[in-house]
């Protein structure tokens, strides 16, 4: 694999893994790990604005601020705008993973680890679901939609969540996120509630509440509410998710 940093910010890191065999890639929550034959690992976190774009070999001149370029035999990819792009050793990867909560997409993930933190916390469940040290990988869309699907107000404290409610939330997150990976897009509206109404934006999945502030709830017609919780937009139905 040829690894470079056209932008220059990752030049030293790229040189450490350039011309090595990329053995495997894996994700832990929102953290992408590229494992190279030397044992070094490139850690990428896209954040809100990062993205990969793929193209066939030979790749053209870099466009924009390309943090990392990977070029294989037939295809390559450019990384732009990540929150993190760094080379880690095996112990550093272990420390990173140890800081994360269970990932619904990983087989063997233990939801009890998350439950032990949730049921002792007075923070809102809407905050806890987005805390990567509690659960790894849940973003704003899944947070809003899974709480709606189970009639749970995002403002409810973790201490007020029952174990059976948490078990149902976890099982639903596992199913929804795996479907999203398999299909390449999110599917969160149950078939019986999906009557083909437009999404909140072109080429985006239809949702119950996410990005639908002021629009009627798909089930009860109550206007979807919006607020900001810990710096992130929050959406819910006041009738279907009573406080």
Short names for language-model regions:
Residues 1-100, 238-243:
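Acidic, proline/glycine-enriched N-terminal capping motif
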Residues 2-18, 26, 31, 115-243:
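Basic, nucleic-acid-binding surfaces and adjacent catalytic neighborhoods in DNA/RNA-processing proteins
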Residues 49, 73-75, 80, 86, ...:
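Generic hydrophobic/packing signal
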Residues 56-59, 96-107, 156-163:
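Short histidine-centered catalytic/ligand-binding loop motif
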Residues 60-64, 73, 108, 119, ...:
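Short, amphipathic alpha-helical segments
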Residues 83-123:
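A short, charged helix-loop
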């Amino acid at each position: 694999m040829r690894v470079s940093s056209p932008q220059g910010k990752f030049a030293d890191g790229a040189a450490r893994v350039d011309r090595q065999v990329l053995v495997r890639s894996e994700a832990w929550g929102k953290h992408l790990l590229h494992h190279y034959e030397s044992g070094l690992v490139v850690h990428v976190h896209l954040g809100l604005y990062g993205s990969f774009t793929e193209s066939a070999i030979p790749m053209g001149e870099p466009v924009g601020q390309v943090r990392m370029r990977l070029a294989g035999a037939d295809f390559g990819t450019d990384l732009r705008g990540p929150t993190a792009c760094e080379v880690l050793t095996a112990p550093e990867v272990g420390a990173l993973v140890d800081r994360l909560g269970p990932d619904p997409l990983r087989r063997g993930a233990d939801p009890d680890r998350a439950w032990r933190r949730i049921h002792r916390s007075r923070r809102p469940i809407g905050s806890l679901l987005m805390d990567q040290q509690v659960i790894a990988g849940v973003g704003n869309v899944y947070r809003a939609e899974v709480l709606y699907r189970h009639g749970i107000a995002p403002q409810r404290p973790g201490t007020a969540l029952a174990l059976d409610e948490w078990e149902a939330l976890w099982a639903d997150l596992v199913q929804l996120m795996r479907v999203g990976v398999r299909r390449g897009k999110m599917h969160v509206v149950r078939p019986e509630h999906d009557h083909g109404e437009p999404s909140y934006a072109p080429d985006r999945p239809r949702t119950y509440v996410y990005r639908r502030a002021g629009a009627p709830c798909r089930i009860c017609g109550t206007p979807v509410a919006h607020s900001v919780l810990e710096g992130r937009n929050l959406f819910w139905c006041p009738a279907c998710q009573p406080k």
